[in-house]
């Protein structure tokens, strides 16, 4: 089922929770709404579900205007963060509940309801637990029951509101892989809300990055991570560093020295340089580079993260190096240069990047 959100505005009192939001979700797509608290992602999900009504704008399911329809009329499957299972019902009865309470004209036979519930429990790998109660299940098992219950009604759209937020890290990782497999097998149009960027990038076909009630960027995980279109997206997705720089005569300067990167034909003036900790190369000497004193070093999985003080009260930057390369750098001065970076002109969060580069394009010169 295709879902189209057109020019949606939602106000709570005088507070604009969403402002002119438009989004096309393809049939069978798994899409993530990602953003910090207060970005509007949960409000958008609730509007699609019919749990809230838009102040302005329209929501289409296929070619049909669903804006005035109830939750039941929209045929939505909803999975919440805290399961919302019926404690007094068995696993099988929880899964079958949505079918059992349908109006008589639309209700399948008891045999068909049981068959579908059993099939879904097999799909979510809970066969044999039909007679257990929620209190007898682990958190991961309860969330699987909640998903099976949502799918039992054969929903037009499946909505997941931070479904793994209450689970520990290892269980979340396992369920993410499992949910992607389930989606690929069933083909439901699925929208899920998360503040966990790793979860969004791993699971989704496309990611919708939201901030302050607006959509900042929509794209595949690769597009979002590798080609962020605004300072907000660059800073929110993954780890990043930003430096105040100056463009002068086609070169990029930090403080009082060029750093070995070209600014192309951009006019002179102030800008911000963004780069990721792993997108750097070390430089012998420092003719046209950045340099800083190592103030902290910590091991993170297969890399070592070094915190560098660039001086002049500038916020520290962080770079990542292989542990063996970083072993000799403790408390020493490191010269480096970004290998992949973006420039944004100062004064506009929405402005497109001035320059996007994947390698330094100006040889180091001078001292």
Curated annotation (Swiss-Prot):
Q: Which GO MF term does the entry hold, naming one?
A: ABC-type sulfate transporter activity
| Gene3D superfamilies in UniProt | P-loop containing nucleotide triphosphate hydrolases
Its EC number(s): 7.3.2.3
Keyword ATP-binding set for record: yes
- Return the PROSITE patterns for the record: ABC_TRANSPORTER_1, ABC_TRANSPORTER_2, CYSA
SMART domains in alphabetical order? AAA
Question: Can you supply one Gene Ontology CC term for this chain's record?
Answer: ATP-binding cassette (ABC) transporter complex
Its localization reads: Cell inner membrane
Q: Which UniProt keywords apply?
A: ATP-binding, Cell inner membrane, Cell membrane, Membrane, Nucleotide-binding, Plasmid, Sulfate transport, Translocase, Transport
User: Which residues of this UniProt protein bind ATP?
Assistant: 35-42
What InterPro entries does the database record attribute to this sequence?
AAA+_ATPase (IPR003593), ABC_SmlMolc_Importer (IPR050093), ABC_transporter-like_ATP-bd (IPR003439), ABC_transporter-like_CS (IPR017871), P-loop_NTPase (IPR027417), Sulph_transpt1 (IPR005666), TOBE-like (IPR024765)
Report the top EC class in one word. Answer: translocase
Domain named ABC transporter is located at 3-237
Sorted alphabetically, which SUPFAM superfamilies does this protein's record hold?
Answer: P-loop containing nucleoside triphosphate hydrolases (SSF52540)
Give the catalytic activity: sulfate(out) + ATP + H2O = sulfate(in) + ADP + phosphate + H(+); thiosulfate(out) + ATP + H2O = thiosulfate(in) + ADP + phosphate + H(+)
Instruction: Please tell me where this protein is predominantly located.
Output: membrane
User: Subunit notes for this chain?
Assistant: The complex is composed of two ATP-binding proteins (CysA), two transmembrane proteins (CysT and CysW) and a solute-binding protein (CysP).
Q: What does this protein do?
A: Part of the ABC transporter complex CysAWTP involved in sulfate/thiosulfate import. Responsible for energy coupling to the transport system.
What is the protein name stated in its UniProt record?
A: Sulfate/thiosulfate import ATP-binding protein CysA 2
- What organism does this protein naturally occur in? Rhizobium meliloti (strain 1021) (Ensifer meliloti)
Upper taxonomic lineage: Bacteria, Pseudomonadati, Pseudomonadota, Alphaproteobacteria, Hyphomicrobiales
